[in-house]
Amino acid sequence: MVAVSGTQHTRTVSPTRWIVYAGSVFAGAWLATQLFYLAQIALWSFVNPGSTAFMRTDAWWLSRDKPPAQIQHQWVPYDQISRNLKRALIASEDSTFATNNGYDVDAILQAWEKNKARGRIVAGGSTITQQLARNLFLSREKSYIRKGQELIITWMLETVLDKERIFEIYLNSVEWGRGVYGAEAAARYYYRIPASRLGAWQSARLAVMLPKPRWFDAHRGSAYQAQRAAVIARRMGAAELPQSE
């Protein structure tokens, strides 16, 4: 018997090919995520969101730290929320909401300069639509990557939904204290009335809370809240609501 010897060749993969492969996987995952967000938003054109990313995170922490506690949230239709609260939020959070495209370039640039001066992210320059994008899908983490994703989701919201629907979802999902979400829950938690009965002064005080709802919940009746509420109350008359209002 004659033995035949041969040479075995080991196939190596170049680093460039690995980089291309990894990049393709990352791009595919990123695209799938964006399509998921877009599909969810399209569904919410006619179906109300059951919960948000913020609510789910809060529910987990409450179940761990305060087992009996639960998220307080009750969806109510747009026309069952006081116009006072709508005007107060626009006056406080996004005065051009009815006419802008979801972005306030001046506010974003101002936030950029402020963050650069501080050496860290302390401001975001977010419109109502940007806040909604963050609440629905993202986290409270402050990073430029999260901000970039927020801007993309904002574009999706503004493209798929009309302004009134965006505002309706916002009003029903924004946080007003730990475990307190939406106008109805906030009105009952702080004033023991439905959101439809909120007066101008009550609405102004609720609007003040939005940047730091948990802090204001723990420091009710602060002098700053009263002063800021007075400023918002004066601006409410000029607040422009979405066209159908």
Swiss-Prot record:
Gene3D superfamilies given in the database record: Biosynthetic peptidoglycan transglycosylase-like
InterPro entries on file: Glyco_trans_51 (IPR001264), Lysozyme-like_dom_sf (IPR023346), PBP_transglycosylase (IPR036950), Pep_trsgly (IPR011812)
Residue ranges crossing the lipid bilayer per the database entry: 20-42
Gene Ontology annotations for the cellular component aspect, listed alphabetically: peptidoglycan-based cell wall; plasma membrane
Keyword presence, Glycosyltransferase: yes
Family indicated by similarity: Belongs to the glycosyltransferase 51 family.
Source organism: Burkholderia lata (strain ATCC 17760 / DSM 23089 / LMG 22485 / NCIMB 9086 / R18194 / 383)
Gene Ontology terms describing biological process: cell wall organization; peptidoglycan biosynthetic process; regulation of cell shape
Class of enzymatic activity (EC top level): transferase
Catalytic activity reported: [GlcNAc-(1->4)-Mur2Ac(oyl-L-Ala-gamma-D-Glu-L-Lys-D-Ala-D-Ala)](n)-di-trans,octa-cis-undecaprenyl diphosphate + beta-D-GlcNAc-(1->4)-Mur2Ac(oyl-L-Ala-gamma-D-Glu-L-Lys-D-Ala-D-Ala)-di-trans,octa-cis-undecaprenyl diphosphate = [GlcNAc-(1->4)-Mur2Ac(oyl-L-Ala-gamma-D-Glu-L-Lys-D-Ala-D-Ala)](n+1)-di-trans,octa-cis-undecaprenyl diphosphate + di-trans,octa-cis-undecaprenyl diphosphate + H(+)
Protein's recorded name: Biosynthetic peptidoglycan transglycosylase
SUPFAM superfamilies found in the cross-reference section: Lysozyme-like (SSF53955)
Presence of the UniProt keyword Transferase in the record: yes
Pathway named in the protein's UniProt entry: Cell wall biogenesis; peptidoglycan biosynthesis
Lipid bilayer topology: Single-pass membrane protein
One Pfam family matching this protein: Transgly
Keyword line: Cell inner membrane, Cell membrane, Cell shape, Cell wall biogenesis/degradation, Glycosyltransferase, Membrane, Peptidoglycan synthesis, Transferase, Transmembrane, Transmembrane helix
Function: Peptidoglycan polymerase that catalyzes glycan chain elongation from lipid-linked precursors.
Assigned EC number: 2.4.99.28
PANTHER family hit by this protein: BIOSYNTHETIC PEPTIDOGLYCAN TRANSGLYCOSYLASE, MONOFUNCTIONAL BIOSYNTHETIC PEPTIDOGLYCAN TRANSGLYCOSYLASE
Gene Ontology molecular-function annotations: pentosyltransferase activity; peptidoglycan glycosyltransferase activity
Subcellular localization, as worded in the UniProt entry: Cell inner membrane
